[in-house]
């Protein structure tokens, strides 16, 4: 292609990243504590209109044959046990995780020149935990969980809207919506957590926590 507009040419796109670095001496002992620090800063940046949805993460899975797929979902909880998101258990990602529980998460905080990459194992949350979260969802989102047979082929948008409208009649605002039996959460127990900080001249800082058999974590610096 010789007529490519330079403005839209990915090879010509350049960004000079921030000067501040990330040093081993600044890290928390546990990766989830370090994540808490960075997530708080990302949330503050979101409040200032700099970052959009700091809890958005790219979830990458692979099926039993090793075929990968990725999608953006919203993290709804995190603690020392890992990261939690909710989905339809009939979706592609849930089917992948049933066959292959290894998963990767990516938090892309581009305006801050930061990203966090997590690898680990997924397991379903308990039904009590799922129900407790479902009750906090807006009424419309609760109906949406019933209306969408996620990842299935549908004839048209009108089909989806009609299903939603029927559910709205069945469960009007103010009436309790039951938790769909095929809907729930996954908790990702991290095995590695990498904190990436953009630096000048592409000499970025990459510090990765690696889980040890005794429950401790070691930190290693990766070449950019």
UniProtKB/Swiss-Prot annotation:
PROSITE patterns: PYRIDOX_OXIDASE
Organism from which the protein derives: Streptomyces avermitilis (strain ATCC 31267 / DSM 46492 / JCM 5070 / NBRC 14893 / NCIMB 12804 / NRRL 8165 / MA-4680)
SUPFAM superfamilies with a match to the protein in the record: FMN-binding split barrel
Recorded metabolic or biological pathway in which this protein acts: Cofactor metabolism; pyridoxal 5'-phosphate salvage; pyridoxal 5'-phosphate from pyridoxamine 5'-phosphate: step 1/1; Cofactor metabolism; pyridoxal 5'-phosphate salvage; pyridoxal 5'-phosphate from pyridoxine 5'-phosphate: step 1/1
Positions bound to FMN: 71-76, 86-87, 92-93, 115, 150-151, 196, 206
Organism taxonomic ancestry: Bacteria, Bacillati, Actinomycetota, Actinomycetes, Kitasatosporales
Keywords: Flavoprotein, FMN, Oxidoreductase, Pyridoxine biosynthesis
Enzyme class: oxidoreductase
GO terms for biological process, alphabetical: pyridoxine biosynthetic process
Record protein name field: Pyridoxine/pyridoxamine 5'-phosphate oxidase
InterPro entries (UniProt xref): Pyridox_Oxase (IPR000659), Pyridox_Oxase_CS (IPR019740), Pyridox_Oxase_N (IPR011576), Pyridoxamine_oxidase_dimer_C (IPR019576), Split_barrel_FMN-bd (IPR012349)
Needed cofactors: FMN
